[in-house]
C-alpha cells in the first residue's frame, strides 16, 4: 500500500492522521459503492451512495459506515476481485482515524471524504499500483 502521495496535499487538514483517514475512508467506500452498481455509469443508484449525507456527515455516521465494510464485503464477495484491498484500505483508514484527534468532520472532513469518494478509482489504483489491463473500475 503506497500512501506517500498524501504528503503532496497542502491542505492542513489532510496533513493530519484524522484527515488522511477520512480521505481514505472516502476512497474505500467510494470504490465499494462502484461495485454495487457493477459498471453502471450512475453511481447515485448505489445503495451505499444513497446512505451518505454529503456535506453533512458527522464522525458517528462515518464510523458506522466503516464498521459495516466487513459485512458488505461478505455480502458482495461473489464477483468482487478486490475485496481484500478494500478491506486493507478501510483498516488503514480506521487506524488513522483512531490516531487522530477526536473531532467532528465539519467542512474540512466532509470535503476530504467527498474528494476521496468521488475520485475513488483514481486514488485506489494510486495506492495499490497500476490497474490491471482490461479491468473496469468496479471492485
Please provide the spans of the model-predicted regions.
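Intrinsic-disorder/low-complexity detector
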Residues: 1-139
Amino acid at each position: 500500500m503506497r500512501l506517500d502521495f498524501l504528503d503532496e496535499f497542502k491542505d492542513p487538514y489532510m496533513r493530519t492522521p484524522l484527515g488522511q483517514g477520512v480521505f481514505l475512508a472516502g476512497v474505500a467506500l467510494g470504490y465499494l459503492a462502484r461495485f454495487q452498481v457493477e459498471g453502471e455509469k450512475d453511481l447515485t443508484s448505489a445503495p451505499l451512495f444513497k446512505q451518505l449525507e454529503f456535506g453533512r456527515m458527522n464522525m458517528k455516521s462515518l464510523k458506522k459506515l466503516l464498521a459495516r465494510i466487513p459485512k458488505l464485503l461478505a455480502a458482495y464477495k461473489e464477483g468482487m476481485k478486490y475485496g481484500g484491498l478494500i478491506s486493507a484500505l478501510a483498516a488503514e483508514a480506521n487506524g488513522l482515524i483512531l490516531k487522530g484527534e477526536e473531532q467532528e468532520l465539519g467542512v474540512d472532513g466532509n470535503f476530504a471524504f467527498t474528494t476521496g469518494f468521488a475520485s475513488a478509482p483514481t486514488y485506489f489504483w494510486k495506492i495499490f499500483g497500476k490497474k490491471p489491463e482490461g479491468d473496469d473500475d468496479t471492485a
